[in-house]
């Protein structure tokens, strides 16, 4: 597997250095270990269904009842492909936010909370409307409070697109983007090579299972039938037959090219931290932005190790989830200073 490399890596910030767990720096171990160390949600989530203007819904998993915590700084999490609160990175970060006295929430993309969504659409890497609507609803419903958004993988690319599209109008004070596939087409091809095919097969099975549940619950809400769905063998094929078609793109390549955040990064106006690992097995080297393409309010951190949304440090007996400290530490300036 080829590592992500760039001749410009030294020009980026590398504050808060990530040191991988001794003996476990391998990218695949880093990618898979979080599921061993973060198996269960350690807090009792407060669930809320948010009805959307088009008749669909998204489910919210809060760290506590938001009506009783409207004064607290807010941390919003956007998960990755087929992720949810149960994803180790999601509930781990919400728990970390809770420990700091912040209000944390995971906004599940349509159909990702365990119940199929109703409408003739799903979610994708460039679908920013739901996130935008939710962030504005959050402010209307609970009033003004310092707010940060964090996006992982697919959710990270989506968040980058949202930040670029809305600039200073987006009601967040800062953002963090982790392991985002900023060049969707290149990453799609990368997932079809070498050991990365194992991850593609895993994710594709999740996508197909979710789509099958949607077809069973709401027949006709996807542009293919169950027999066609079963024959899909690659994520690119899934995107070609379903994601692109249902959202008005010509095909998967058209979807990838229109929704890749790379060309939009220079339009991000809010303070933003972007984190990638050089050895991310999901990524192609093309996800690395050129230093001159980033505005001064965007900090880029490229680590030697970490895998895909892994970043496990410490020891086997005392593992340290680096993102659960790095992200809140970086956001403190924007969340706690404004709440004083």
PLM segments and residue spans:
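The serine-hydrolase catalytic nucleophile loop
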Residues: 83-95, 285-287
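N-terminal cap/lid segment of alpha/beta-hydrolase-fold proteins
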Residues: 24-70, 312-318
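Conserved alpha/beta-hydrolase
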Residues: 86, 94-118
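Short beta-strand/loop motif that positions the catalytic acidic residue
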Residues: 268, 274-276, 280
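Alpha/beta-hydrolase-fold enzymes
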Residues: 4-10, 140-246
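Catalytic active-site module of serine/aspartate enzymes centered on a nucleophile-bearing elbow/loop
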Residues: 304-340
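Short beta-strand element of the alpha/beta-hydrolase
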Residues: 71-80
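Catalytic nucleophile-loop/oxyanion-hole region of alpha/beta-hydrolase
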Residues: 110-148
């Amino acid at each position: 597997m080829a590592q992500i490399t760039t001749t410009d890596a030294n020009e980026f910030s590398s504050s808060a250095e990530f040191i991988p767990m001794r003996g476990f720096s391998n990218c695949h171990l880093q990618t898979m270990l979080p599921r061993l160390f973060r198996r269960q949600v350690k807090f009792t989530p407060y669930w809320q269904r948010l009805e959307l203007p088009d008749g669909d819904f998204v489910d919210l998993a809060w760290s506590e009842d938001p009506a009783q915590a409207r004064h607290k700084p807010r941390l919003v999490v956007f998960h990755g492909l087929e992720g949810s609160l149960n994803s180790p990175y999601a509930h781990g970060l919400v728990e970390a936010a809770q420990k700091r006295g912040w209000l944390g929430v995971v906004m599940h993309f349509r159909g990702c909370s365990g119940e199929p969504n109703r409408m003739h659409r799903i979610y994708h890497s460039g679908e920013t409307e739901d996130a935008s609507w939710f962030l504005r609803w959050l402010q209307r419903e609970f009033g003004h409070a310092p707010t940060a958004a964090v996006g992982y993988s697919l959710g990270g690319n989506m968040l980058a697109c949202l930040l670029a599209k809305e600039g200073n109008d987006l009601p967040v004070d800062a953002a963090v983007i982790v392991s985002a596939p900023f060049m969707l087409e290149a990453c799609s091809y990368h997932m079809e090579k070498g050991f990365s095919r194992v991850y593609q097969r895993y994710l594709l099975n999740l996508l197909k299972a979710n789509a099958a549940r949607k077809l069973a619950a709401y027949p006709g809400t996807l542009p293919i039938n169950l027999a066609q769905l079963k024959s899909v063998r690659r994520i690119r094929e899934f995107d070609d037959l379903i994601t692109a078609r249902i959202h008005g793109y010509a095909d998967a390549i058209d979807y990838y090219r229109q929704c890749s955040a790379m060309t939009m990064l220079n339009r991000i106006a809010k303070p933003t931290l972007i984190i990638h690992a050089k050895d991310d097995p999901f990524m192609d080297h093309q996800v690395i932005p050129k230093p001159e393409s980033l505005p001064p309010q965007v900090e880029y951190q490229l680590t030697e190790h970490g895998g895909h949304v892994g970043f496990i440090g410490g020891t086997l007996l005392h593992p340290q989830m680096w993102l659960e400290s790095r992200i809140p530490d970086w956001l403190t300036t924007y969340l706690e200073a404004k709440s004083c």
